[in-house]
Amino acid sequence: MNRSTKTWPIALQRIAERALGEQAGQSLWQKYRAAFSAEYRALVSPRYALKDMLNLERITSSNNQCISLLNPGRQVEHYRLHFYSRQPRYLDEYIPVLENMHLRVMDQVQFSITVDGITLFIKSFTIKAKSQCASFAKL
């Protein structure tokens, strides 16, 4: 186990406790701490994992789907778009919608998260806006 693998859960715990208060943060962390795979931990920072946990809690209690846009920082020109659902989803369900929004999909991955015997899914896309310059070049 490398250092980042060991520190990721601790960072998530601290972020959850800071954001939600010690008791609520600790409770949420305990519920999800073993739910995230090594692949998820490698791709998603603890800061965004908290956002994912809160959205997964929403769909668990409401039986709806939701989405979240994650901005990785100032020096990065792409975003991560997470779709949360109670069943696995396929690319053909998302690509037409993303293309209609003039978004370019750079990659995608689906995570399955099992918490309290319920499996939930996060479909994660790396996206960026398509350049509109080409359409204006003819003017």
Regions found by a protein language model. Name each.
Residues 1-103, 109-139:
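Non-catalytic interaction/regulatory segments
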